[in-house]
Amino acid sequence: MEKFNTHTGLVVPLDVANVDTDQIIPKQFLQKTERVGFGVHLFHDSRYLDHDGTQENPDFVINKPEYKGASILLAGENFGCGSSREHAPWALQEYGFKVIIASSFADIFYGNCINVGLLPIKLTEAEIEQLFKLSPNAQLTLTVDLPNNVVTCGELSFKFSLNEFQQYSLENGVDSVGWTLNKLDTIKAFEEKMPAWQ
């Protein structure tokens, strides 16, 4: 998992509420556990005109030339709802997204994003609407400053928050397993103090 500090990237606006994990990565593509090979299937049913994924839908926003190379996804409310699947953030990340911004996320999806180093940012509905209004007129670029918990766009700035563990995990590139392994000496010392079962 890579450390996250600051990131400046092009925004792709997906102005759709309640995008569920099956829309993000349909179930037929969940047949492996390695974290590779999912980006090509991201938003498959909207992104492609055919079942095989060989003919792109030119009307789907991430296929539009002006959004090629975008690394920040601006989304509608309740993003990532539906069934729990780690493959959804894997697909987003492998496609090239480093940040997802929405007014709300499904809780499990939000946690899965943190676990893989994909930064989910919650802004207010009014702030999200403001960004959506900016995005169609020009290529919108945002800078995300994780240590200071701020998103900037020119003169505009938007604060966001994470809990202490989420902040630590992303800034240090450490997931929950890695965090536990970093505390191994403390865990061993505690266990040595505990009386043995008799």
From Swiss-Prot:
Q: Give the Pfam families listed for this entry.
A: Aconitase_C (PF00694)
Q: Does the keyword Amino-acid biosynthesis apply?
A: yes
Q: What are the alphabetically sorted keywords of the record? A: Amino-acid biosynthesis, Branched-chain amino acid biosynthesis, Leucine biosynthesis, Lyase
Molecular function via GO? 3-isopropylmalate dehydratase activity
Top-level division of the source organism's lineage: Bacteria
GO biological process entries: L-leucine biosynthetic process
Query: Which GO terms of the cellular component aspect does the record hold?
Result: 3-isopropylmalate dehydratase complex
| Group of enzyme by EC | lyase
Please name the CDD domains in this protein's record.
IPMI_Swivel
Q: Which reaction does it catalyse?
A: (2R,3S)-3-isopropylmalate = (2S)-2-isopropylmalate
For this protein, the record's InterPro entries field holds:
3-IsopropMal_deHydase_ssu (IPR004431), Aconitase/3IPM_dehydase_swvl (IPR015928), AconitaseA/IPMdHydase_ssu_swvl (IPR000573), IPMI_Swivel (IPR033940), LeuD (IPR050075)
Q: Which residues form the signal peptide?
A: none
Could you tell me which pathway this protein works in? Amino-acid biosynthesis; L-leucine biosynthesis; L-leucine from 3-methyl-2-oxobutanoate: step 2/4
UniProt lists the family membership as follows: Belongs to the LeuD family. LeuD type 1 subfamily.
Function text:
Catalyzes the isomerization between 2-isopropylmalate and 3-isopropylmalate, via the formation of 2-isopropylmaleate.
The record's note on quaternary structure and interaction partners says: Heterodimer of LeuC and LeuD.
Protein name in UniProt: 3-isopropylmalate dehydratase small subunit
Species of the source: Colwellia psychrerythraea (strain 34H / ATCC BAA-681) (Vibrio psychroerythus)
Q: Kindly list the organism's lineage.
A: Bacteria, Pseudomonadati, Pseudomonadota, Gammaproteobacteria, Alteromonadales
* Gene that this sequence comes from: leuD
